[in-house]
Structures are given as structure tokens and as C-alpha cells.
């Protein structure tokens, strides 16, 4: 269909699609919205009444890490409010440490609200596909991955 462009898989490509390819509506992250606003593009965003999908990244430590003390120090550093605020400002995310929402020069005191802090209850978090689930409607990861590639390819 001529109004269907593509399913984006790269946030910067999505920004370019809005800027240069005539895309006028899409699902996105705050990163794209903030980038388009910074580039003076006519853009706005909304979380629908039904909610939106999203995710929370994690940092994991391998059980047999060669230098676990170093890894723990990095994890501790990454949870610092300044670091969390800076990353949230750059990526358009909400920090894992709520204290990062205030007093960060990059994020500003309105950054968490801009990036959706108050919409947390409207987010339906992504889950890893499961082959077996209580509803019997789940698909294995391999099928999900194949279908995802097909969607990205427009099939």
C-alpha cells in the first residue's frame, strides 16, 4: 500500500524517514521525537489511551566473569544519578534511578516528564517470545524472529 512505508528497525533511519521520506505517523521511542524536535521538525507524540509497548534494558554479569569485581564497580557507576540522567537525556529514556530526574543539566528538570516518566503504568513491557504459555497462543522465538524479518522486509 502506498501509505505504508516500512517497519523501522533503526531509530536513526526512522528520524530520516520523517525528515526526508514523507513519513507522517509511526510508532517510535522518545529518542526519535526528541531528535526531530531538536532538528526543528514539526512533530508531536502521544501515548494512546490503550497504552504503548516498551522495554527496560538490563545489565547482567556472567557467573564465570573473569573480573567480577570490576564488573560490579561498572554496574555501581552506571547506577549513579548523574550517569542515569545523562543517558536518559541522550537516549530519550527514563532513568532507572528516579533521583536522576532532578538537577541534571542535560536532562533538565522536565526531561523525565518529556520522556514519559508519568506514563509508566501505560507501558506494556515486551517479553521474550515463549513456545509454551498458559493461553496456548504463544510462538517460539525462532518463529517470532522469522516473522519479524518478514515484517521488516515488507512481506
Question: Could you describe each region identified by the protein language model?
Answer:
Residues 1, 16, 77, 91, ...:
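Extracytoplasmic/cell-surface-exposed regions of Actinobacterial cell-envelope-associated
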Residues 1-2, 8, 22, 37-40, ...:
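Sec/Tat-exported extracytoplasmic proteins
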Residues 1-48:
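Ligand-binding pocket segment of bilobal, Venus flytrap-like solute-binding proteins
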Residues 6-10, 53, 62-67, 136, ...:
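Extracytoplasmic/periplasmic, Sec-exported soluble proteins
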Residues 8, 29, 55, 144-148:
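Tryptophan-centered motif/residue detector
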Residues 15, 19, 27, 72-79, ...:
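Non-transmembrane alpha-helical segments in soluble domains
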Residues 53, 57-124:
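Mature extracytoplasmic/periplasmic domains
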Residues 122-155:
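Conserved C-terminal helix/tail region of periplasmic/extracytoplasmic solute-binding proteins
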